[in-house]
C-alpha cells in the first residue's frame, strides 16, 4: 500500500511539472488561412534584404505576413508549412509584412512569393482560401549569425540576428566592465537597437525555446557579420536531454576575416573566448530566473556562477510544501 502511494505521488508530481512547462514548439494546425502573391519580394520589412544575398534565406520560398500574424516584427524569420485541401503544401519563411487593406487585414493571411503560391494553386486564381498552416523549424545550415546595421557608430548600433532555425525571443547586451545584461527592444523591421556601445561588449541571444548563445564583439563595425558558436534546438525533447548543449561565448578578432560575402559584409574568423558561460535551457526557467545561474539537473544542486546575484525561486520554495500536502492527503485516503 505504501509503495502504491509513493508511486502515485511521484506520478502526480511528474505530471504537474510537465504540464507547467509550455513547449514553444508544440504548434497546432490553424485552419481558415488565405493567400495572395506579390512580386517585389526582395528588401522586405524583416531586414533580410536580397533573398539570395548574404542575409537572406537563400531561396524564394517566402511570405509577407498579414498585419495580425506579423506581430510588429516578432514573427520575422518564422517558418510556416502551408497546405491546401488537396494536400499540396509549401514551407515558407516570414521575411516581410503585408499591411495593405483587405486581405492583409485577415487574421491568418499570407502574401506569398509567386513560386510559393504556384505550389498551392494557379496564379490566375489570384486568391487562395481554405488553407491551413503550422509553424515549423526553418531548414537553415550553419550557426546563428548576427550583424551590426549600417550606420552603426560609437554612440549607436543595431543588431540583426538571422540564420536561426527558430525565432529570436530576446537580444541583450552588456559592456565588458558591467555585470548586467540589458535587454533590447525589437523594432518592427526586425533589428535590435542600442546606444550602449563603446569598446568591447557582449551580446546574448535568446531563442523562443529559452536557450542562450553568447557573442563577444570587440568593437562596433557596420555590416560586419559574425557567425556564432551554435544553433538553437527545434523541439522540446532536445531541450530536455540529460546533457544539454553548452553554447560557449565566442570572441572575434576583427583583424582576421574570411572571404567577403559582398563589398560591405565580412565574416570574421572566430577565436574561442577564455571565459565560458552556459546557456540555460527552457526546462530550467521555472527554477531559475537569473541568467547567471544554471540548474544542475542530475545532482539537483544550485551552481552559483555569480556571487553578486541572489536566487529568488518561488517554485523551489513552494514545491516541498506542495508535495507534503499531496502526500498527507493520499496517506489519509489509503489509511
UniProtKB/Swiss-Prot annotation:
Topological domain spans for side Extracellular: 21-314
Recorded topology in the membrane: Single-pass type I membrane protein
Positions with biased composition (Low complexity): 249-272
Localization terms from the record: Membrane
Signal peptide (residue range): 1-20
Chain ranges of the Expansin-like EG45 domain: 43-143
Database matches in SMART domains: DPBB_1
Gene Ontology cellular-component terms listed: membrane
GO biological process entries: slug development involved in sorocarp development; sorocarp stalk morphogenesis
Keyword rRNA processing set for record: no
GO terms of molecular function: cellulose binding
Sequence intervals crossing the membrane: 315-335
Stored SUPFAM superfamilies: Barwin-like endoglucanases, PHL pollen allergen
Keywords recorded for this protein, A-Z: Disulfide bond, Glycoprotein, Membrane, Signal, Transmembrane, Transmembrane helix
Disulfide bonds, paired cysteine numbers: 46-76, 79-138
Residues with glycosylation annotation: 87
Region (Disordered): 247-276
Family: Belongs to the expansin family. Expansin A subfamily.
Function: May serve to lubricate the movement of the cellulose microfibrils during cell growth and wall extension and/or may serve to maintain the fluid state of the slug cell wall.
Protein's name in the database: Expansin-like protein 3
Source organism of the structure: Dictyostelium discoideum
Lineage: Eukaryota, Amoebozoa, Evosea, Eumycetozoa, Dictyostelia
Amino acid at each position: 500500500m505504501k509503495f502504491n502511494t509513493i508511486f502515485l505521488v511521484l506520478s502526480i508530481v511528474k505530471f504537474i511539472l510537465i504540464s507547467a512547462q509550455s513547449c514553444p514548439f508544440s504548434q497546432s494546425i490553424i485552419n481558415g488561412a488565405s493567400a495572395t502573391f506579390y512580386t517585389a519580394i526582395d528588401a522586405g520589412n524583416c531586414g533580410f534584404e536580397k533573398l539570395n544575398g548574404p542575409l537572406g534565406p537563400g531561396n524564394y520560398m517566402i511570405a509577407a505576413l498579414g498585419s495580425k500574424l506579423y506581430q510588429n516584427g516578432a514573427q520575422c524569420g518564422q517558418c510556416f508549412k502551408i497546405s491546401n485541401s488537396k494536400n499540396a503544401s509549401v514551407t515558407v519563411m516570414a521575411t516581410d509584412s503585408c499591411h495593405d487593406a483587405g486581405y492583409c487585414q485577415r487574421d491568418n493571411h499570407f502574401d506569398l512569393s509567386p513560386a510559393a503560391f504556384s505550389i498551392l494553386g494557379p496564379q490566375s486564381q489570384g486568391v487562395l482560401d481554405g488553407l491551413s498552416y503550422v509553424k515549423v523549424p526553418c531548414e537553415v545550415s550553419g550557426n546563428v549569425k548576427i550583424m551590426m546595421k549600417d550606420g552603426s557608430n560609437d554612440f549607436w548600433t543595431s543588431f540583426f540576428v538571422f540564420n536561426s532555425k527558430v525565432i529570436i525571443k530576446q537580444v541583450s547586451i552588456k559592456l565588458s566592465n558591467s555585470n548586467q545584461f540589458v535587454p533590447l527592444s525589437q523594432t518592427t523591421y526586425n533589428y535590435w537597437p542600442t546606444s550602449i556601445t563603446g569598446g568591447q561588449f557582449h551580446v546574448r541571444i535568446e531563442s523562443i525555446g529559452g536557450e542562450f548563445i553568447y557573442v563577444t564583439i570587440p568593437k562596433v563595425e557596420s555590416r560586419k557579420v559574425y557567425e556564432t558558436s551554435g544553433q538553437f534546438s527545434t523541439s522540446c525533447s532536445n531541450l530536455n536531454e540529460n546533457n544539454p548543449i553548452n553554447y560557449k561565448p565566442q570572441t572575434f578578432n576583427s583583424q582576421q576575416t574570411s572571404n567577403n560575402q559582398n563589398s560591405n559584409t565580412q565574416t570574421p574568423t572566430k577565436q574561442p573566448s577564455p571565459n565560458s558561460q552556459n546557456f540555460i535551457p527552457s526546462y530550467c526557467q521555472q527554477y531559475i530566473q537569473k541568467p547567471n545561474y544554471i540548474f544542475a539537473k542530475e545532482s539537483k544542486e544550485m551552481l552559483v556562477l555569480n556571487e553578486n546575484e541572489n536566487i529568488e525561486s518561488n517554485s523551489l520554495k513552494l514545491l516541498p510544501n506542495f508535495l507534503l500536502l499531496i502526500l498527507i492527503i493520499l496517506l489519509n485516503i489509503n489509511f
